[in-house]
């Protein structure tokens, strides 16, 4: 098995004249297939970093049960998944082929996503297959990039990190010149037709009633049912990302350009984070609309905290997060519980569950064992996912999966792919859902989906009017 050795070199420049968006606009045409990951929570030291990843060196993807690895020497390897050759083994094997030394090597890792559909590789869950002839998206894709631009918003610092192989010349001067360039191409965005959904409001309400019936029968305690929307468009979808990050700032902002398609969004929810030997899950369960009036919003948050249906849902999903972490962790505890957090269109109840990794626990396996999030599937998780496959008329694709970073040391930070667009073939696909329990009401659940979609639909409207 071949290995690839790199040294990470870095250069620090003053960052007070730059933003992640301004730099991304300058470099994206020169470095196609790039990724942008931001945090809007600049006030907290722990969430004060944003990243731009440029120039793919290598990647690992899984599609239709085949693992495809591409390497810096332009070689490719394909191997089918088997009972012994699992996604976990493939990922660990791929990571082990890269050795990186030098300063800031911790940001040199894999940036990418795992779709909800990938659950079929981890559990016996049927998934409706659908593939795009022109721009098919793998069920899972993680990319190693040559350059990482790191923004430290807390310190106003910009660090350019480059992975260099032996004998390679630095490309940092060209990258720095691109960043300092005052000019960049600008493109418009427009919608070319009305937004549509594969199912009507009444059909979604009927699906909700099916979910309630399964809860009443005791098949599940809770099930998350979602609905997809499609918006045809022309032009530059990055304007939709810019609008969304402005309307709905979140801890996880991301724009991944994978060539034939793009995945971008503004997620409030940590799927799984592993750092310094501890794993974290931040379940969000319990949602109400936001009015923008401070007094009314506080009253709505208090009503949410007192709502028996929302409380039952939240308790269930905190327990599920504890169970998921307990598979590979000890000292599992709840760090904060049912904290109201305010977003542009909604108020969420959020908890944080953490566990100490067992000695010898594999970090990738720990991540996979938490997938998908209970807040996007239900409880018990496997039965809920089986019912989702029966009830929802389409597969979920990226929605409900996760997106983020996996370090070469296995430490990772993954957001749940919600409040997210998938852009492909001049269509924006977006989706939202809600947790169904025995006490749910179909009309309320329909309204909850509309509340969650509010920021996405508003972002499309705003993007049309962005002039530069």
Predicted regions and their residues:
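Extended alpha-helical targeting/anchoring segments
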Residues: 1-468
